[in-house]
């Protein structure tokens, strides 16, 4: 029994010791109270940390707590004494004085006298004026040092905060190109209330409290807010929304309140919250209760920014996001984020302005055609154009290194590769050492270790060809987001299909190029076009040509890629496509294999597929505005598409892309063989009217030309490849290769029509069913 009682006492002492050590560490870090604490304070602390200690009798608990406090005090004494011993020993080593060594004992005596005061019940009862003075002076000095430390810390924090609230000075609105409409709207909504609040007070108009900037990544939301702050010259609070989130309960809401309180104290003030969707998601879909509390705190703080609560000094909030639909709906109502400004993917004219603005700080050489460069950068946002400029600069530097230090001026004898050449070998005047760019740059750095002089820097400049080469190295962010760059297919790449070209020009291309003409006759809603017909007849090629001709943003969607096995994800993907298109209008959406997305709704169709059909129907002709968004769909099974897709207002124009006739086959062959060298004996007119081409589609004719070219290449170059004689093969490759009639005859044996007579009759019956559409197309 005695052993068990001893072990219990040790366990109790160990528990209390752990709790009091944590209390001591906390006090030393925060300095909110003095150490050592009283026995009563220690008992209160350990009972709060461990509920089981409340069941122990008070005398026993007091005895153990006092014992642990004495132990901790002794540890502090030893550390203090050892630190002072070290200080005195170091000073003695420097002075080499024996008299100073005796001061260690006196210091220890003083330490003991001071630490003995800790166990006394009341400092006032201690005798000795010297001890009182020493203790009082030490406590006063310690508290003064702590106050001084706190004041210095707080002062440095305040100075840092004040420095961060200055508006950025490295960018202005004149440095931004292609966003003229957005800048004018921001000046109206933000600059006017901040600069002239008296106008709103006099007229009794409530100015907007918040403006939401949304658009694809890299379009300039953050840069626009920084430039506006510099233009206004008012205190600017810029915060990243994820930095508000804290792991401690209540800390996130506290940070939100502190930021808004600081903004009101600095009023007139402009606040910018980047990636605001990270902290204000929809409350019904929030994963944690903390997210709901943060949203509620944001709503409350936004309501407190009225003129009445800010003493007539305006505080405006600008939020930025690329996912506006994920924000809580209460945050987007009037009185909070009153206005929303959409920064779209820049058009060709906007890209030209952006490039001209970026070129102001560059050293360019030659005649730059910014208009042509803007045409070659469809889908590029401001960040992509900046990356393009940087890539062009790197290419220019590599080129200039080669020009400044040509290979014949470098010390070629130092290259070890020359030592490996045989003595009887010599380089001709036209020969050069095959060095790569890395070796050129390395040799240049070795030859010029010092900074270049102004005379050497003079030839450094970026030429137009550097930008052309950089286009292949920079991928637009919109392409990673689901956009496709404008295809390099024009009407010249398409043979025949002239009647369908005219219909597509009237339905898609001209409304984008000349919208005022259509508005003058009352046509405002965009048209949807359904291209249907046998496979391989050029439906996808037509859509690419339309996108290229209109110079609009282009989104290519293959029907099955939007389908998802999770509930609601397919519908969300459909909505996201139209959301991106509306943000980048004018935009052409091309749905390939539409029958996979919108099959006919009946009892056999699953509920998930029905929801996808309903979502697409409402996006095409629902409550949401579809201005500037044009839809082209392609299918070879129009009979299984839901009939509601084909009513007016959706895909109301159906165009049959049928198999080409004899005359159209000749035109297609002429287009396909522009890059193929043909023998004089080849007659494309006879070839296109051959009976064996009766059911050939455009894709079949392309396969025929490709197979004939491969046959000619095999007979001219690779005839001896099986015998493993590369020298003969290399010699044969130097001879001109031309495709002959014999090559086409061999190709006819391998290429068969992809559409049978039975399939063609089926499409003819479908064309009769839609007689009105097919008759117009046939004309």
Curated annotation (Swiss-Prot):
It is found in: Nucleus. Keywords: ATP-binding, Nucleotide-binding, Nucleus, Phosphoprotein, Repeat. GO terms for cellular component: nucleolus; nucleus. CDD domains: RecA-like_NVL_r1-like, RecA-like_NVL_r2-like. Residues 125-174, 759-779 are annotated as: Disordered. It holds the Pfam family AAA_lid_3. It comes from the Eukaryota. SUPFAM superfamilies: P-loop containing nucleoside triphosphate hydrolases (SSF52540). Residues 144-158 have a biased composition (Basic residues). The keyword Nucleus applies. GO terms for molecular function: ATP binding; ATP hydrolysis activity; preribosome binding. Belongs to the AAA ATPase family. This is Uncharacterized AAA domain-containing protein C16E9.10c. It comes from Schizosaccharomyces pombe (strain 972 / ATCC 24843).
């Amino acid at each position: 029994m005695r052993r068990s009682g001893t072990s219990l006492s040790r366990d109790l002492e160990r528990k209390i010791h752990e709790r009091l050590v944590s209390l001591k560490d906390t006090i030393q870090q925060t300095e909110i109270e003095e150490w050592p604490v009283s026995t009563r304070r220690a008992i209160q602390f350990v009972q709060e940390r461990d509920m089981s200690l409340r069941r122990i009798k008070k005398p026993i608990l007091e005895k153990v707590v006092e014992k642990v406090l004495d132990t901790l005090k002794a540890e502090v004494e030893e550390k203090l004494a050892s630190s002072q011993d070290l200080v005195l020993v170091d000073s003695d080593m420097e002075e080499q004085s024996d008299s100073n060594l005796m001061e260690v004992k006196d210091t220890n005596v003083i330490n003991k006298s001071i630490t003995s005061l800790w166990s006394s019940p009341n400092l006032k009862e201690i005798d000795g004026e010297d001890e009182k003075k020493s203790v009082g002076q030490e406590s006063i000095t310690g508290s003064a040092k702590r106050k001084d430390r706190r004041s210095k810390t707080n002062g440095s924090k305040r100075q840092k905060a004040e420095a961060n609230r200055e508006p950025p000075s490295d960018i202005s609105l004149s440095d931004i190109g292609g966003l003229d409409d957005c800048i004018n709207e921001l000046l109206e909504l933000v600059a006017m209330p901040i600069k002239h609040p008296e106008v709103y007070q006099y007229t009794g108009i409530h100015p907007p409290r918040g403006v939401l900037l949304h658009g694809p990544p890299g379009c300039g939301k953050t840069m626009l807010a920084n430039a506006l702050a510099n233009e206004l010259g008012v205190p600017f609070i810029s915060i990243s929304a994820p930095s508000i989130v804290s792991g401690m309960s209540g800390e996130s809401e506290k940070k939100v309140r502190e930021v808004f309180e600081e903004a009101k104290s600095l009023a007139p003030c402009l606040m910018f919250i980047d990636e605001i969707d990270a902290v204000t998601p929809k409350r019904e879909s929030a994963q944690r209760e903390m997210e709901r509390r943060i949203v509620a705190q944001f709503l409350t703080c936004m309501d407190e920014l009225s003129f009445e609560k800010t003493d007539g000094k305006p505080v405006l909030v600008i939020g930025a996001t690329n996912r506006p639909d994920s924000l809580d709906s209460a945050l987007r109502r009037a009185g909070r984020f009153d206005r929303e400004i959409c920064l779209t993917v820049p058009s060709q004219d906007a890209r030209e302005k952006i490039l001209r603005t970026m070129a102001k700080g560059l050293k360019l050489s030659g005649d730059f055609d910014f208009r042509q460069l803007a045409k070659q950068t469809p889908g590029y946002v401001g960040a992509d154009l900046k990356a393009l400029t940087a890539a062009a600069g790197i290419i220019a530097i590599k080129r200039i290194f080669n020009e400044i230090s040509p290979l014949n001026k470098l010390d070629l004898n130092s290259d070890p590769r020359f030592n490996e050449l045989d003595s009887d070998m010599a380089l001709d005047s036209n020969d050069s050492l095959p060095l790569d760019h890395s070796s050129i740059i390395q040799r240049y750095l070795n030859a010029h270790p010092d900074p270049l002089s102004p005379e050497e820097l003079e030839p450094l400049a970026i030429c137009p060809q550097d930008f052309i080469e950089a286009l292949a190295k920079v991928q637009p962010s919109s392409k990673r987001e689901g956009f496709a760059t404008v295809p390099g297919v024009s009407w010249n790449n398409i043979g025949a299909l002239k009647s369908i070209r005219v219909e597509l020009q009237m339905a898609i291309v001209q409304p984008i190029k000349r919208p005022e003409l259509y508005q003058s006759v009352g046509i405002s809603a965009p048209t949807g076009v359904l291209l249907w017909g046998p496979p391989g007849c050029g439906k996808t090629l037509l859509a690419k040509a339309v996108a290229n001709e209109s110079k609009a943003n282009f989104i290519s969607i293959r029907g099955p890629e939007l389908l998802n096995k999770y509930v609601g994800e397919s519908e969300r993907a459909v909505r996201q496509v139209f959301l991106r298109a509306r943000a980048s209008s004018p935009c052409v959406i091309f749905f390939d294999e539409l029958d996979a997305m919108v099959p006919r709704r009946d009892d056999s169709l699953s509920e998930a597929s029905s929801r996808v059909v309903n979502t697409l129907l409402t996006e095409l002709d629902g409550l949401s505005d579809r201005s500037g968004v044009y839809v082209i769909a392609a299918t070879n099974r129009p009979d299984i598409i839901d009939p509601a897709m084909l009513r007016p207002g959706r895909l109301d124009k159906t165009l049959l892309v049928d198999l080409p006739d004899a005359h159209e086959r000749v035109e297609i062959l002429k287009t396909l063989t522009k890059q193929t060298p043909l023998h004089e004996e080849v007659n494309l007119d006879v070839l296109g009217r051959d009976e064996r081409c009766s059911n050939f589609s455009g894709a079949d004719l392309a396969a025929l030309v490709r197979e004939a070219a491969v046959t000619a290449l095999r007979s001219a170059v690779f005839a001896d490849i099986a015998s493993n004689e590369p020298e003969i093969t290399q010699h044969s490759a130097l001879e001109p290769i031309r495709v002959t009639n014999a090559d086409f005859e061999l190709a006819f044996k391998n290429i068969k029509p992809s559409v049978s007579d039975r399939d063609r009759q089926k499409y003819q019956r479908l064309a009769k069913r839609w007689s009105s559409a097919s008759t117009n197309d046939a004309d």
